[in-house]
């Protein structure tokens, strides 16, 4: 019996689990994988804002003095490239000036200017894609007498949809906001929508000359248009204006007044009729009268007849006088004012104009009268500081 008791104690001591830190237990497995990656950032706002239309009025300027809505003085380049219509105005307002689109800045005098156009750059591009899925969690701990802890949960779910929708209509602020927040569960929230288009679209600039939107069929040297009419509906953007007119086979234009589509404030003088021709030569002298009638016939059994009558009187009267010469006139209508002008601006405007010193008799005489003062003969709409141009691009 003593032997059996000793044997049982030996077996029990052999099977006992060590309790000290220096024992031979298997270490606990490591935890699972980390969270998913961050979502991508949304795209920045798009560039491409043009403060002025292409063509004649393509120079953005900050101007101090407006002259009747058609010219400006004391102009200079904006201090930085405008990002939108409001930004252009803000840059110029900061120095006490106005945002203008001008023909050419000559010694601070912009000559021909019109108001800037509204709107902003295109909205931002699509936001970036969300981050990739988070890494898979670690495997579960191995099965043992004391199993390891469960592996970490899987990383974040799908990395998020595309950062943002399209950047919105023209104008507006920057495009979508940043694509998404931290990854974690969803890889990132959707990026913000792109900015909306700028409000208050004006098809044509305000002012005296170019405020009437028109759809025109025929362009004349880029400064005049024929066969113009109002667009069929109010344009909502520059592209919409062009589309409305293109549907009728016409072009979008900004015009002064739709008067049979004629444009351009000053044009080269065109002549009236030449002076009347000289009168015909005087009529020839009348023929001499006929000879005297014959003597009476002698007496006889058959007396002769009476002599003929005397010849006719003198010939017809002198010919009429020649007609008087004509006087020069500009064509009736839009270009009815004859002017002598000193300075031509790109063939579409004139400065320093005045009435000719006398009434010209014909186009050559008109040119001679003006040339005597070192000026050119022109037919103008109105002598208003010589500013001109009826139509320009949208």
Curated annotation (Swiss-Prot):
Q: How is it modified after translation?
A: Several N-termini starting at positions 17, 20, 22, 28 and 48 have been identified by direct sequencing.
Q: Which cysteines are joined by disulfide bonds?
A: 52-101, 62-92, 63-75, 102-113
Cross-referenced Pfam families: Hydrophobin_2 (PF06766)
Superkingdom of this protein's organism: Eukaryota
Q: Which InterPro entries match?
A: Cerato-ulmin_hydrophobin (IPR010636), Hydrophobin_sf (IPR036686)
- For the region Hydrophobin 3, give the residue spans: 326-394
Signal peptide boundaries: 1-16
Q: Which family does it belong to?
A: Belongs to the cerato-ulmin hydrophobin family.
Name this protein carries in UniProt: Class II hydrophobin TH1
Q: Which organism is it from?
A: Claviceps fusiformis
Lineage of source species: Eukaryota, Fungi, Dikarya, Ascomycota, Pezizomycotina
